[in-house]
Design a protein with these regions (language model features):
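Structural marker of alpha-solenoid helical repeat scaffolds
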Residues: 48-49, 82-86, 121, 125, ...
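N-terminal leader/linker segments that initiate helical-solenoid repeat arrays
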Residues: 6-74, 250-258
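Helix-start (N-cap) detector for alpha-helical repeat units in TPR-like alpha-solenoids
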Residues: 21, 53-54, 87, 92, ...
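Alpha-helical adaptor scaffolds
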Residues: 103, 121-193
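Register position in tetratricopeptide repeats
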Residues: 33, 65-66, 104, 138, ...
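Canonical tetratricopeptide repeat
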Residues: 58, 97, 131, 135, ...
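Residue-level recognition of tetratricopeptide repeat
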Residues: 27-29, 61, 100, 138, ...
Length: 258
């Protein structure tokens, strides 16, 4: 799940005067982080009792927290539409989260639409806009629009230079487009921002192997495994190391003289 928890947990605090609905919203979000199944039931009932956009926002969050992204997308989108009708500036964040869930659900076209609506609002902070641009880049690349994805990532890096994910995804995309000098620059920045992220070490190895630097690739993939041995990145790194070993020529031995 991409960036869902930190952003949605900010939503309850966005209004200056807490109402009963705001209190219930905060309680619902908290429950969703601990027991998403119960929060799904609670938020669904709340929505049926005229809970409005806040009930739907929590319902969508709970569904996404429970990895039911395909169900979360329309509910978060509905929350955004209803919030716009109420003049609630959190609509932009609801659109952002609908887009985030759509990416996880494998619906990049819906994600681009939702994220574009989110970014059309002026209510997002720069770091939030950067996150939305990163998500939009993911969706655009999934749709085969690499140039548009590059532009979105460039905007994200400008909005939030401290956003390590923006630099990491920029590195990955540059490598795939065979822009290896750019990829190296991006991954070095990402590594400085996210020194303990196995995804960064894995990508650093991928860039090194693409550049023909087997030794650096090996070291980076070994580091990936050392950082997070039980991660999916470690599984990939292990496979990459095995492939590298298989492709390497066997050491030759000098014949012994008699």
């Amino acid at each position: 799940m991409l960036n869902l928890l930190p952003l949605l947990l900010q939503l309850a605090a966005a209004q200056p005067l807490p109402t009963l609905d705001e209190v219930q919203f905060e309680e619902c979000l908290t429950l969703a982080t601990k027991d998403p199944a119960s929060a799904i039931s609670s938020a669904s009932l709340w929505a049926q009792q005229n809970g409005g956009h806040l009930a739907r926002a929590c319902h969508g969050f709970a569904l996404a927290t429970d990895f039911k992204f395909d169900l979360a997308v329309p509910i978060l989108s509905e929350a955004a539409v209803l919030a716009e009708a109420k003049g609630d500036l959190r609509a932009a964040r609801f659109w952002a989260q609908a887009g985030n869930a759509a990416i996880a659900a494998g619906q990049p076209d819906i994600a681009v639409d939702a994220l574009t609506k989110s970014l059309a609002s002026k209510s997002l902070e720069n770091n939030e806009r950067a996150d939305s641009e990163v998500d939009r880049a993911r969706a655009l690349v999934a749709l085969g629009k690499s140039s548009d994805g590059e532009a979105a990532l460039a905007t994200a890096r400008q909005l939030a230079p401290e956003n390590g994910a923006a630099w990491l995804l920029s590195a990955t995309l540059a490598r795939r487009l065979n822009k290896l000098p750019d990829a190296l620059t991006y991954i070095q920045t990402s590594a400085a921002l996210l020194p303990s992220d196995p995804a960064v070490a894995l990508e650093a190895g991928n860039i090194a192997i693409a550049a023909g630097d087997d030794d650096t690739a090996r070291k980076q993939w070994e580091q990936t495994i050392a950082i997070a041995p039980n991660s999916r990145q470690a599984v990939t790194a292990t496979a990459q190391l095995a492939a590298l070993a298989a492709a390497s020529p066997a050491p030759t031995t000098e014949p012994q003289s008699r």
